[in-house]
Amino acid sequence: MLPPLQIEIEGTGISRPLSEHVNLLGGLLGQVIQEMAGPEMLELVETLRRLCKQAAQENRPEFREQAYTRIHSATYDELLWLLRAYTAFFHLVNQAEQQEIIRINRERAQQSTPERPRPESIDEAILALKQQGRTLDDVLTLLERLDIQPTVTAHPTEARRRSILYKQQHIAQMLSQQRRCQLTPEEQETLLLDLHNQITLLLGTAEVREERPTVRDEVEQGLYFIQSTIWEAVPRIYEDVRRALRRYYGADVDFRPFLRYRSWIGSDRDGNPYVTPEITRWTALTQRRLALQRYMEELRQLRRRLSLSDRYVAPPEELRRSLARDAREVSLPPHVLRQFRHESFRLKISYIMGRLHGLLQALDDPTQPAPDYDADAFVEDLRLLQRCLEACGLERIARHDQLTRLLVLAQTFGFHLVTLDVRQHSSVHEAAVAELLRLAGVENDYRALPESRRQELLAEELSNPRPLLPPGARVSEATRQVLETFAVIRELVQLDPRLVGSYIVSMTHTVSDLLEPMLLAKEVGLWHYERDPRTGKPGHVRCPIDFVPLFETIEDLEAAASRMEAILSHPVYRMQVAARGGFQEIMLGYSDSTKDGGYWMANWALHRAQEQLAEVCLRHGVDFRLFHGRGGTVGRGGGRANQAILAMPPVVHNGRIRFTEQGEVISFRYALPEIAHRHLEQIVNAMLRVVGLPAASGTDGTDPATRNRLMDELAARSMRAYRRLIDAPDFWSWYTRITPIDQISRLPIASRPVSRSSAREVDFESLRAIPWVFAWTQVRYLIPGWFGIGQALDELLQTSPEHLETLRTWYRSWPFFRTVLQNAQREMVRARLEIAAYYDRLLGDGPTAFHQMIEEDYHRARTAILRITDQESLLDHDPIIRKSVQLRNPYTDVLNLVQLELMRRIRSGAEADREPLRRALFLSINGIAAAMQSTG
């Protein structure tokens, strides 16, 4: 009998608990492979792992050649089993690593003291404020300024099926149980059997969906995380803040909630024809129903807990008056009234539940009248309970028990759960406005007008009370959809103003790009322009939503400040800003900018745009919030959220921030409650530091003009290198040959097409940034996360060696520069050019000039980064990540070699044989995504 799958990670710099977990899971996986596929299959899995490990550790590429030779001769069934085995291995290792993160955080918490709190915790931030002389009032004022809004999206970067995600969560729970509990021998035996069975089910579960998820599927997936881990994590964050204030200031005080969630799932229409107005309505109402149902559950628990008898705890007068009013307005079943006639607190909770039940009935049956009861009234009822408990001398129960948790939930999630954004491309609004103006007889060829005339015309129509669409006129399907979308928004905000918050305009280039959707909103009664009834002069605007420009390309980012200057200077738009309380949100796109200009240019253009946009808003006296459209990978603005906050320009730190949580990032950050809590506390820590301690995000004191000139030069050099690669005549042909981009475009992982034209017509311009990055990650080049910086840094240091000390100083003291270089290092360590060379040689007829260009820039980047950071090897500052990548590489290499073989067979085989090979190729894409812990 063969031994279980050998992992051999002890003594390699990995902690003993992680080593034990990985070896346990690997051993069980080996047993399951042997049981399901036989000892020969397990031997093949182990042989390939050993060969690739020897090739990596001993720098002996001939061992990798031997591995590929064996894969080349493998049967289809053998290739399929290799993919299943190695993919399952990475699913298991990823859970073990998450448990290791949780273990380390718990260990640090146990070792922490009030004087030395856990790093990146809320305690650490509050202590830092105290040490810098901030008073309690200062800290409370700072908390009042905080406005943190994570935004979940359905971007197509989560390759795993929900069935796989649920099994991973179950395995994580068992690993946690094993780590935390002292199990009896019988319990340990049961747990190992359960783990074995879960791994068996994992191996037997299809990795690839049979068909694309629908938008409703995506909504339900997002809501799963919101109503489970996020729902549980948010009250813990507020309790952390209260505890820190008690610990360091001796104060038990209330503060305004600062953390709220937003969502695009079910409302992001840009490029997704399946997000219809009906879907958006269904999404919002589903969220409302779920919020009300969760509150009913919370209230049942609270009612069970507050078993206070009026005979022992006399109800205050305020509670008695409230119950009398409730009795007039809410009808409760007689048995409930009898049951709680001497338990006033429970009776009050029952009346609250009765009101929520009425709201749920009205959702299910619109003919039923809904109670006049909103989230604010719900919060006030909970506050009444809190005051009455305090009046009874039960202050701890009032302020440090289940009621406080429910109050936080109500203030955070309201009756809307999460606020939706609607997003649409600017060209869609342009076409709809052109059609309406033509039908109204106002302008036959709006699209031919210059921008100045467009603005004049739009301003005239926005101030004109009559609608554009003549009675009975028929419009195109596209225009009907746009108008219906605004009508749905109007309907939803009338039900609850928090259901929809923003209308985001993709590819905002001009002032008219924002005026056009305002005109469409006016057409359905969502936007109102009102003159002063006495003088007839311009009065004011009424509008319940924000209009948000989205700047995405390098050109748009470089021009963002001047465009925002023009937008805020427009008299009608300025009235829109006034209608929103003098507030303007601005969104920045991290994905298209990197695809457009490369890693360094995109990062610098985004940094400068933030700085300049903040200055424009401040100059106009406008309160602003920047919305960061970050992806999960470094090539799309990913990385640790708290480091990204610290790296932002100091001028933007006004306490407000939004950022997207996309695709696989959602399941990584929110699948486990402890990981979700850690993610959120790091964000709050960073926001407290940058707003309360401005030096936290400062620079080394270099003259800004000098700094900007040097960074502009580096960005321009980097972009030239990047564009020289991707603009080369044969580049697109090479890229489509050596990467599985064609299969990625068909991968059924999201409702949205990968191309802006169609999923079957892919070229560079229409290809979205997500599959662009996804494909580079699969073949281990990862160029969106680093390429171009080699030429930029090397040329600068060659021509101006005196700048080396400047760059070293920046790395030590400028968070932005340090973060950009550290993120690039991480991607370079994860890149594996020796594996990429196989794709180039066997699929691209290489070695090609493209591979040589990439390899040369890699080595130039590595040399320059090591000189600037004074390291011996990349990621010396983060040896745990470096070691994790090194340990993963041999296993990932096997997946890459199998994928390579499948791509060769698809291209050389008969059409009749290609479909099963394509299915296997989909599985290889999932496997490598699991190994790399990222897609696009």
From Swiss-Prot:
Keywords: Allosteric enzyme, Carbon dioxide fixation, Lyase, Magnesium, Manganese. One of its GO terms (cellular component) is cytosol. Optimum pH is 8.0. GO terms for biological process: carbon fixation; oxaloacetate metabolic process; tricarboxylic acid cycle. Optimum temperature is 75 degrees Celsius. It catalyses: oxaloacetate + phosphate = phosphoenolpyruvate + hydrogencarbonate. InterPro entries: PEP_COase (IPR021135), PEP_COase_bac/pln-type (IPR022805), PEP_COase_Lys_AS (IPR018129), PEPCASE_His_AS (IPR033129), Pyrv/PenolPyrv_kinase-like_dom (IPR015813). The active site is at 155, 595. Exhibits positive allosteric property with acetyl-CoA and fructose 1,6-bisphosphate, and a negative one with L-aspartate and L-malate. Its cofactor is Mg(2+); Mn(2+). Pfam families: PEPcase (PF00311). Its EC number is 4.1.1.31. GO terms for molecular function: magnesium ion binding; phosphoenolpyruvate carboxylase activity. Magnesium. Can also use Mn(2+) instead of Mg(2+). Homotetramer. Forms oxaloacetate, a four-carbon dicarboxylic acid source for the tricarboxylic acid cycle. This is Phosphoenolpyruvate carboxylase. It comes from Rhodothermus marinus (Rhodothermus obamensis).
